[in-house]
């Protein structure tokens, strides 16, 4: 079946691509957007996730302006923020940053917020914000040391990916699992189908 609309994913995250693939969606183009992700003064983590997802979508829209190839396409973006209270735990790039985040998360509840933004072919902007409460077990020094050695914390909000080794740290979770991975699948599909993107016709036949 010829599919009418193209989908640009304004992200380079393999996890978000995998989640879309799980739903039978293959993005037509990946466009990682290099924006300033620093929170504003006193900005709530929820507001940060919402703002950054919108800014990524806006940047992608500006990048394809005038390119007839992508005229009439959908643009999807997302941003995930991990926070303990109002303290935002950024993407860990160095081991000491990851260590600090793990000490904060150990034995505590934290929140994972993902803002999802969709720009439609007629350039309407639709957004959803999804939150999940996660509780880590109390981590031993041995667990932290070995997790740091694995390198799985690199580039991840809060220094962990629930789909990897850190999944063994999760004692309890309330809310969407895919939200913690990086793209709340249920809510994303609702956004797409609500704006005329035919998800189910993309499913493979057996």
UniProtKB/Swiss-Prot annotation:
> In Gene Ontology terms, what is a biological process of this protein?
nucleotide metabolic process
Keyword Hydrolase annotated:
yes
Compartments it resides in: Cytoplasm
Its protein name is dTTP/UTP pyrophosphatase
Q: Can you list the disulfide-bonded cysteine pairs?
A: none
Signal sequence extent: none
Pfam families cross-referenced by the UniProt entry: Maf
> Which EC number applies?
3.6.1.9
Task: Give me the reactions it catalyses.
Answer: dTTP + H2O = dTMP + diphosphate + H(+); UTP + H2O = UMP + diphosphate + H(+)
Among Gene3D superfamilies, the record links this protein to:
3.90.950.10
- Record's keyword terms, sorted: Cytoplasm, Hydrolase, Nucleotide metabolism
What NCBIfam families does the annotation carry? Answer: maf (TIGR00172), PRK01441.1 (NF002401)
Q: What is the role of this chain?
A: Nucleoside triphosphate pyrophosphatase that hydrolyzes dTTP and UTP. May have a dual role in cell division arrest and in preventing the incorporation of modified nucleotides into cellular nucleic acids.
Belongs to which family?
A: Belongs to the Maf family. YhdE subfamily.
- Group of enzyme by EC: hydrolase
* The keyword Cytoplasm belongs to this UniProt entry's keyword annotation: yes
- Gene Ontology MF terms: dTTP diphosphatase activity; UTP diphosphatase activity
Say which species the protein is native to.
Rhizobium johnstonii (strain DSM 114642 / LMG 32736 / 3841) (Rhizobium leguminosarum bv. viciae)
Cofactor entry = a divalent metal cation
Instruction: Tell me which GO cellular component terms the UniProt record holds.
Output: cytoplasm
Where does the record place the site Important for substrate specificity? Answer: 15, 80, 163
* Annotated active site: 79
């Amino acid at each position: 079946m010829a599919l009418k609309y193209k989908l640009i994913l304004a992200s380079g995250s393999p996890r978000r691509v995998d989640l879309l693939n799980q739903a039978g969606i293959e993005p037509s183009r990946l466009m990682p957007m290099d924006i300033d992700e620093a929170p504003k003064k006193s900005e709530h983590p929820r507001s940060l996730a919402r703002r950054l997802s919108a800014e990524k979508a806006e940047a992608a829209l500006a990048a394809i302006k005038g390119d007839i190839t992508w005229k009439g396409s959908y643009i999807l973006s997302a941003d995930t923020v991990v926070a303990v209270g109002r303290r935002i735990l950024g993407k860990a790039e160095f081991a000491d940053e990851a260590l600090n985040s793990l000490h904060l998360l150990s034995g505590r509840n934290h929140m994972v917020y993902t803002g999802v933004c969709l720009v439609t072919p007629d350039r309407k902007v639709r957004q959803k914000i999804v939150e999940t409460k996660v509780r880590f077990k109390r981590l031993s020094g041995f667990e932290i040391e070995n997790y740091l050695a694995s390198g799985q914390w690199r580039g991840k909000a809060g220094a962990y990916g629930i789909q990897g080794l850190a999944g063994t740290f999760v004692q309890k979770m309330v809310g969407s699992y895919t939200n913690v991975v990086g793209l709340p699948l249920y809510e994303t599909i609702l956004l797409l189908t609500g704006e005329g993107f035919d998800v189910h016709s993309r499913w493979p036949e057996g």
